[in-house]
Amino acid sequence: MARNTLLIDADDTLWENNIFFEKTIEHFITQLEHLGYTREYIRHILNETERRNIRQHGYGVRSFRRSLEDTYLKLAGNAARREIVQEIERMAVELEATPPHILDGVPETLAYLAKHHRLILLTKGEPAEQAGKVERSGLQSYFDAIEIVLEKDAGTYARMIEQFKIVKTHGWMVGNSPRSDINPALHAGLSAVFIPHVATWELEKCELESGGGKLLILTSFRELRTHF
């Protein structure tokens, strides 16, 4: 078996992530129902606010909290109440303190893969926040390197290829996000393993595209043992 370099995503690939954000959003929307807007409209405004704030403030709980606050203040206007802002702050603190919930089959699959391939954890987000998740996950020992980046695009993967001297024919990206994990990796000339997650963040969804490498679609992380 050829030794490959596997770049592996973290959030919603190794551990649950977006389900906790979704629970927070549902609670947030409930808090705003008294304003008279539909739940769908509140979510639409929140999504638009997140897209805007990500460009300026990046990813992570702090940016998310800002988006919740901005959405509330926009919709409430002069009727904004301090106790709602305080509740948003409380929800953000609770969200950031949530420990990683490792997905089924991940530890034993990583242990197997680490014996045969070079594993690099590639995750995006606020550096300190993501580093804390990695440490609390207890999975760091399976990886030859851990890379935390602010964004995942084709340029990011090109840098990874150069930094780690990855031979493209033996380089793979493994993840759940078409927008951040799969499409840009393929465009950079790597192959990719798409493992869909039922709760993938709305802003990470897009159509799968073709690229320079091969695309493998699996239903679970443990299936990697069959192919690698």
Language-model features: where?
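Structured helix-beta-strand junction loops
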Residues: T98, K115-H116
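A metal-dependent, Asp-based hydrolase signature
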Residues: T49-E94
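Short, surface-exposed acidic
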Residues: E33-E48, G77-I88, Y142
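An amphipathic alpha-helix signature
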Residues: F21-I29, R65, E69, P127
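Long amphipathic N-terminal alpha/beta scaffold segment
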Residues: E87-P107
